[in-house]
Amino acid sequence: MALQRTHSLLLLLLLTLLGLGLVQPSYGQDGMYQRFLRQHVHPEETGGSDRYCNLMMQRRKMTLYHCKRFNTFIHEDIWNIRSICSTTNIQCKNGKMNCHEGVVKVTDCRDTGSSRAPNCRYRAIASTRRVVIACEGNPQVPVHFDG
């Protein structure tokens, strides 16, 4: 009897929190957010060297079967990146209106075209520049690097 009452109270609490927006169910954004983090976020480093790109592209599993042609690593705290999601919406390349722009430190890694997976070779360019990211969810989180 007490166990059934406990379950009922927990269910009521969960439904209340969902209604208040304090707990949000995941509708696939979590996996996309984790992929965004893996492919694009590296706050500890400033990057900038070819060696950095070669190592990070391999570590982040973007060279397993083919050499990813281009990738950008953002060298900012994840909270700074997430704050971009609160800027004005702009149109993404795919036409959706869930993109946002901000200025961050980055390393752009471009495939040299002279190597084969998994031993891909990259050229690095470090800069501080405008980026566009797509955000989804509640609260909004980055799920796609759009440029």
UniProtKB/Swiss-Prot annotation:
Molecular function terms, GO-annotated: nucleic acid binding; ribonuclease A activity; RNA nuclease activity
Binding site for dUMP: R35, H40, K68, N71, T72, F145
Active site: H40 (proton acceptor), H144 (proton donor)
Keyword Translocase listed: no
Signal peptide (from-to): 1-28
Pfam families membership: RnaseA
Tissue expression summary: Expressed in the cortical and medullary tubules of the kidney, and in the transitional epithelium of the urinary bladder (at protein level).
Record keywords: Antibiotic, Antimicrobial, Disulfide bond, Endonuclease, Hydrolase, Nuclease, Pyrrolidone carboxylic acid, Secreted, Signal
SMART domains, sorted: RNAse_Pc
GO cellular component: extracellular region; extracellular space
Disulphide connectivity of cysteines: C53-C109, C67-C120, C85-C135, C92-C99
EC number(s) stated in the UniProt entry for this protein: 3.1.27.-
CDD domains assigned: RNase_A_canonical (cd06265)
Residue positions where Pyrrolidone carboxylic acid is found in the record: Q29
Inducing or repressing factors: Induced in response to insulin.
GO biological process assignments: antibacterial humoral response; defense response to Gram-positive bacterium
Subcellular location: Secreted
Family according to the record: Belongs to the pancreatic ribonuclease family.
Role, per record: Cleaves preferentially after uridine bases. Has antimicrobial activity against uropathogenic E.coli (UPEC). Probably contributes to urinary tract sterility.
Protein name from the UniProt record: Ribonuclease 4
Organism: Homo sapiens (Human)
Protein's gene: RNASE4
